[in-house]
Structures are given as structure tokens and as C-alpha cells.
């Protein structure tokens, strides 16, 4: 039976529980996050995104390096009904503007003040963008929320409301957008990936000996 990315994530978290899902190097020491905590963080962040205004079908751009924040926000945006799209951290402000506008992003996650500066430089070209989430750093620019400030919005949304968003997802719904790099300009292409297509890719990867999921 076809499932969604979030259904498979929930099943994996329930099955793996206290086993490590993610590892992050902090002050030279690898710290593990269990599947149970990973699930809890994703659901809390999904509620926070809903509270901050992410609506079903909204684009959610990520301009950040690979990290626990990235994968948490990525899955949280899907759970909240959004459609995530990753940007290359080497993108110019103009390339960022192209992708953020093209994917109809109402929110964008940036992991540093350097990446934030790129978005702010083209902010007037992005009328659909409502919120910029800053993982590391501080800013008093309008519409910028730190990661900690974002999490407080979770209090405005119940678990039942989040579950309703998750239950509304269908296997053939759009799950994510993947943009190619533009060698000298904007992205040369965009791949629309449905939930069932994303899971098919996961299964193909796992069958080749590379377990993307337990």
C-alpha cells in the first residue's frame, strides 16, 4: 500500500525508539539524537511552522548546510503540509531569489547570518516570503525569527491539529522540489517529487546496500 514520507518516518521512529537516528558533532564530540527525540523534534517544529503561518501547499526553502536542524525542518515542513526545496549554500543572492520565488516559499530557513544577508539583499523581490528562520545568529530585521523564537509558536497549535495535516497528505501529493545547480546563472531545472516517488527512491537505495532508513 502506498504511503507518505511522514507515515514512513513515524513508523520508523516507533520501531527504532531509543536507537540513534542522527549524530551531531558538538565541541569535537559526537552527540546522538534518538529516533524518539527526532520524531518529537519534528512534530514540535511542524506545529511551530503551522503557528507561524505555514499553510498547506506553501513552499518552504532551506538555505543551509546539512545538519540536524536541516533534516528536522525539512520533515516538519512536509508534516505541516508544506513543500520543501533545498538551495545550494553557494548560491548568489539572485539565485536564491529565483528558487525562493519559483517554489512559492512563504518561509525560508537559513543557518547563518551570511546566508541571511543573501535573502535580505533580495527581500524586495520576494512578495510571497513572510518569514525567515535563522538557526544560528541574531537579527533585528523584520520577519526574521531565530530557531528558538520559532519553537514558541508550537504552543499555538495542538497535536490534533498537526495530525489532521499529516492525515490529509496523500501518496501522490507533491512532497519536495529538487533544483539543479545553475553553472553561470539560475537553476536549469526542477524535479517535482511526490511522496510515493520519494519512497521508491529510498527503497531502491536501500536495496543497493545503502540503508537510507532502518
Tell me the role of every PLM-derived stretch:
Residues 17-20, 134, 139, 151, ...:
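Conserved pre-ATP/AMP-binding loop-to-beta segment of ANL
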Residues 64-66, 112, 173:
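Helix N-cap/beta->alpha junction signal
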Residues 22-75, 92-97, 146-154, 194:
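Conserved AMP-binding/adenylate-forming core of the ANL superfamily
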Residues 32-36, 175-199:
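Conserved AMP-binding A3 loop
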Residues 39-44, 171, 190-211:
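Conserved structural elements of the adenylate-forming
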Residues 8-33, 135-142:
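AMP-dependent adenylate-forming
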Residues 60, 77, 108, 174, ...:
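Conserved S/T- and glycine-rich ATP-binding loop of Class I adenylate-forming
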Residues 9, 51-52, 79-152:
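Structural core segment of the AMP-binding/adenylate-forming
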Amino acid at each position: 500500500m502506498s504511503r507518505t514520507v511522514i507515515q514512513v518516518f513515524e513508523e520508523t521512529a516507533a520501531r527504532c525508539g531509543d536507537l540513534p537516528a542522527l549524530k551531531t558533532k558538538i565541541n569535537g564530540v559526537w552527540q546522538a539524537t534518538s529516533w524518539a527525540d527526532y520524531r518529537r523534534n519534528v512534530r514540535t517544529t511542524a506545529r511551530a511552522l503551522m503557528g507561524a503561518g505555514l499553510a498547506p501547499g506553501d513552499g518552504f526553502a532551506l538555505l543551509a548546510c546539512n545538519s540536524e536542524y536541516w533534516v528536522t525542518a525539512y520533515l516538519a515542513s512536509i508534516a505541516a503540509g508544506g513543500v520543501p526545496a533545498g538551495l545550494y549554500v553557494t548560491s548568489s543572492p539572485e539565485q536564491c531569489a529565483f528558487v525562493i520565488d519559483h517554489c512559492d516559499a512563504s518561509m525560508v530557513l537559513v543557518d547563518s547570518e551570511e546566508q541571511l544577508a543573501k535573502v535580505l539583499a533580495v527581500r524586495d523581490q520576494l512578495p510571497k516570503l513572510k518569514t525567515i528562520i535563522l538557526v544560528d545568529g541574531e537579527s533585528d530585521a523584520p520577519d526574521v525569527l531565530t530557531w528558538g523564537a520559532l519553537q514558541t509558536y508550537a504552543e499555538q497549535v495542538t497535536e490534533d491539529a498537526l495530525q489532521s495535516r499529516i492525515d490529509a497528505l496523500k501518496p501522490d501529493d507533491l512532497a519536495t522540489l529538487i533544483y539543479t545547480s545553475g553553472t553561470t546563472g539560475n537553476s536549469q531545472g526542477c524535479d517535482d517529487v511526490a511522496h510515493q516517488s520519494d519512497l521508491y527512491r529510498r527503497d531502491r537505495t536501500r536495496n543497493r546496500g545503502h540503508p537510507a532508513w532502518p
